[in-house]
């Protein structure tokens, strides 16, 4: 079933309440006359069914709530975490890594593991697939890149289903799994123009020839299951098991409610990985020796794409407690910046590039 037919199928017609006169002459509402299990019972049953059916796909990984070593990072030396932040941050990352390469730091080769979320999933996938190197070699970096990234930004005025998803996402006060499910429901019901094949084409702009494969074992993308609220982590092994190409993993991680997606990974519809209280998913690198963590904000100040609290500093303290040494780079955002506005891209490229010149020597020392 295609995504459009699936959503048409979900549209239901309103059914009026029929009054049925029983033998006693009492008028009974037909809706109440039907024997339906109470909500808690059906919810419990639904959870049991879902857990049983999806237990073997290997995609769901609980978010750590206390310091603990990640099975993915155990025994590794250098790891890198790339957080999210819309089109602005994708452009910032590109300028940043362009500058690091000029300074002698090839971030496509140094880390043994990269965790990317939303914008970070795009740039991480671009780096490790080799596409970023090709793009910066073939094109005038500051001339051509803004044109490429403008294709990623939403081009149409949002409709009411998109506005609903956005407003629900921007009304969240916690990152509980129940809150994630509510946002996920709204994301699923949003009629996003940036969807399906178009999302894949956008993803392939940065990930290159990765629409049929997951070419690197070092790249992990994150997302949130719209139905269950679970954290989804995709690496090469689970990607090949579920038939997930790298371009789709990056697209799902960047499927912001009311803007793009959700994106189908295996048999799960997945939304932006930042829709939780560990927005960069730093717990996945806990136990590695040294982690370079790059986030758009400190979780307290700066532009946001959800109102779910983002205690990034505490997330990082937890992985330090698990034995990981951390260098944390906070990109920061200009006052009043729109993270989804393509007009911001040229400036973001230059800002990231300039920041690389400030950080290069520190990163060299950290990973020496």
Task: Report each predicted region and the residues it spans.
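Boundary at the C-terminal end of the N-terminal hydrophobic targeting segment
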Residues: 31-35
């Amino acid at each position: 079933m295609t995504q459009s037919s699936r959503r048409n199928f979900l549209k239901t017609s309103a059914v009026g309440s029929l009054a049925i006169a029983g033998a006693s002459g009492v008028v009974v509402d037909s809706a109440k006359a039907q024997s339906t299990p109470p909500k808690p019972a059906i919810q419990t049953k639904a959870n049991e069914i879902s857990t049983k059916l999806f237990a073997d796909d290997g995609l769901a990984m609980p978010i750590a709530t206390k310091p603990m070593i990640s099975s993915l990072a155990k025994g590794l030396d250098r790891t890198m975490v790339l957080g999210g932040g819309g089109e602005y941050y994708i452009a910032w990352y590109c300028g940043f890594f362009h500058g690091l390469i000029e300074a002698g730091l090839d971030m496509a080769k140094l880390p043994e593991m990269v965790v990317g979320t939303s914008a970070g999933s795009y740039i991480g996938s671009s780096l490790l697939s080799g596409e970023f190197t090709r793009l910066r070699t073939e094109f005038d970096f500051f001339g051509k890149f803004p044109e490429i990234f403008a294709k990623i930004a939403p081009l149409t005025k949002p409709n009411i289903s998109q506005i609903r998803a956005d407003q629900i996402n921007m009304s969240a006060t916690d990152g509980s799994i129940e809150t994630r499910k509510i946002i996920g429901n709204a994301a699923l019901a949003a009629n996003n123009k940036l969807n399906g094949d178009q999302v894949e084409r956008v993803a392939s702009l940065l990930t290159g020839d990765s629409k049929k494969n997951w070419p690197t074992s070092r790249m992990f993308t994150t997302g949130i299951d719209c139905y269950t609220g679970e954290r989804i982590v995709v690496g090469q092994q689970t990607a090949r098991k579920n038939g997930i190409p790298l371009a789709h993993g990056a697209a799902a991680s960047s499927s912001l409610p009311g803007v793009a997606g959700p994106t189908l990974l295996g048999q799960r519809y997945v939304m932006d990985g930042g829709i939780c209280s560990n927005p960069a998913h730093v717990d996945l690198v806990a136990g590695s020796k040294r982690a370079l963590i790059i986030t758009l904000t400190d979780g307290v100040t700066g532009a946001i794409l959800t109102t779910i609290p983002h205690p990034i500093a505490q997330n990082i303290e937890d992985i330090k407690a698990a034995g990981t040494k951390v260098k944390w780079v906070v990109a920061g955002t200009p006052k009043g910046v729109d993270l989804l506005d393509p007009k911001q891209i040229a400036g973001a490229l230059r800002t990231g590039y300039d920041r690389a010149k400030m950080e290069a020597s520190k990163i060299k020392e950290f990973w020496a």
